[in-house]
Amino acid sequence: MGCDGGTIPKRHELVKGPRKAVKVDKTAELVARWYYCTLSQEKLCRPIVACELGRLYNKDAVIEFLLDKSADKTPMEAASHIKSLKNVTELNLADNPAWSGDKESKKGDTYDDIQSARFICPVVGLEMNGRHRFCFLRNCGCVFSERALKEIKTEVCHKCGVPFQEEDVIILNGNKEDVEVLKKRMEDRRLKSKLEKKSKKCKSAESAAQQVTTEDSPGPSKVKNSKDCIASSSGEKRHIIFTKSSDDRSSSVPGKVNKASTATKRSIADTATRNLRHTNLFTTHSSAKRPKEECSNWVTHTAYCF
């Protein structure tokens, strides 16, 4: 049987089978991972930072996420491993001289080249557009292509000369296997830092305890002598310290004058002359005393008798 117009329908047009899985466009996925921030989904602009798993972020978005970690604003899966700014590294990127994306005005009749990248590898010159594998160093933040590190094998950064190890190399936007390896390294690194902090705290506590014990322990001058300690009838000990005055030592030596005693005598005489005006004001002074002839032979309530 045919339909109107003489058309004959087929089976696949009438019977609906299972839906096919939606395939994501690879170019669109690369653009989203290499040109946009993982947190805010905005275009990447300097300063650009990368986490220990190789994901790219805007630094402003990371700071906002750390200040307000609400699940409504940012996806927690993308930044759940970021606890502070120490967990991210600011990237030192090399600009592409042939890139003019923001300078030219984009119109509907112009062709937008997605493959052109804003940054390139400073050694080989490959564009950082997702077609080639790129990595950065945790020590300095310089970004290179993986090909450059394989072709020129060194233990020093090609750009700034900072030494690095194999563990410091982190691949940007790697596949699932790369992310698993980087995650394991991140966990080991954080566990190692925690153990180092604990060991430092234990060492500081031990050093403080040693200082306290050294301050409390008596030195050679503070050791008690058995001759100086005399046991009393009540069981208590009294400490008797015998000291010799400096006057006795100086007097025992012939031909030497005691300078301390003369200094004290002079000081007393000086004070007596200075206080002469003040002593005249009191009745105990010699000028205020009456002679015996003027003194009365009886005692009154306020006897002025001296």
Curated annotation (Swiss-Prot):
Belongs to the rtf2 family. This is Replication termination factor 2. One of its GO terms (cellular component) is nucleus. Residues 235-250 have a biased composition (Basic and acidic residues). The keyword Repeat does not apply. It is found in: Chromosome. Replication termination factor which is a component of the elongating replisome. Interacts with nascent DNA. Residues 193-265 are annotated as: Disordered. One of its GO terms (molecular function) is DNA binding. Pfam families: Rtf2. The keyword Membrane does not apply. Its main location: nucleus. The gene is RTF2. One of its GO terms (biological process) is mitotic DNA replication termination. Keywords: Chromosome, Phosphoprotein. CDD domains: RING-like_Rtf2 (cd16653). It comes from Gallus gallus.
